């Protein structure tokens, strides 16, 4: 279970992590600057297992992999959004960051306590006593996430061979 950090529509990668930090390659260092201009308290207050919740087109803008890397390094459980920019979605899956699509994110408020049942495909809003369905991921994407990202998934395929 974790806290919802609520954001709006069209959160672009420059808002997630500013371009001036692209010289940093350590995810833990990047995590210190996530949403720095939009919500300066985020990096200091986010806890392992929390959720970033947003509207439409999350991760739009430039295709930098630093954005999902920085988010993952904060310890969040997942990003929950109505929709994603395609390249952000792919980058997130590739590095093992859970990205969930839910059309009912408007019902989630900042600070709500959430829990996700990945098997049932449901988000439980413990604060409001509500449930919201998530769009199921194809099995091969679930397997990539379970392995921790595309590199680990590829290693597991090689080990199976």
Curated annotation (Swiss-Prot):
Catalysed reaction, written as an equation: (2R,3S)-3-isopropylmalate = (2S)-2-isopropylmalate
EC number: 4.2.1.33
Molecular function per GO: 3-isopropylmalate dehydratase activity
Keyword hit for Lyase: yes
Superkingdom in the source lineage: Archaea
Membrane spanning stretches: none
Pathway it works in: Amino-acid biosynthesis; L-leucine biosynthesis; L-leucine from 3-methyl-2-oxobutanoate: step 2/4
Pfam families to which the protein is assigned, alphabetical: Aconitase_C
Family annotation (InterPro entries): Aconitase/3IPM_dehydase_swvl, AconitaseA/IPMdHydase_ssu_swvl, IPMI_Swivel, LeuD, LeuD_type2/HacB/DmdB
SUPFAM superfamilies the record matches: LeuD/IlvD-like (SSF52016)
One GO biological process term: L-leucine biosynthetic process
Record's keyword terms, sorted: Amino-acid biosynthesis, Branched-chain amino acid biosynthesis, Leucine biosynthesis, Lyase
UniProt record similarity statement: Belongs to the LeuD family. LeuD type 2 subfamily.
Self-association state and partner proteins as the record states: Heterodimer of LeuC and LeuD.
Function: Catalyzes the isomerization between 2-isopropylmalate and 3-isopropylmalate, via the formation of 2-isopropylmaleate.
Protein name: 3-isopropylmalate dehydratase small subunit 1
Organism: Archaeoglobus fulgidus (strain ATCC 49558 / DSM 4304 / JCM 9628 / NBRC 100126 / VC-16)
Gene transcribed to yield this protein: leuD1
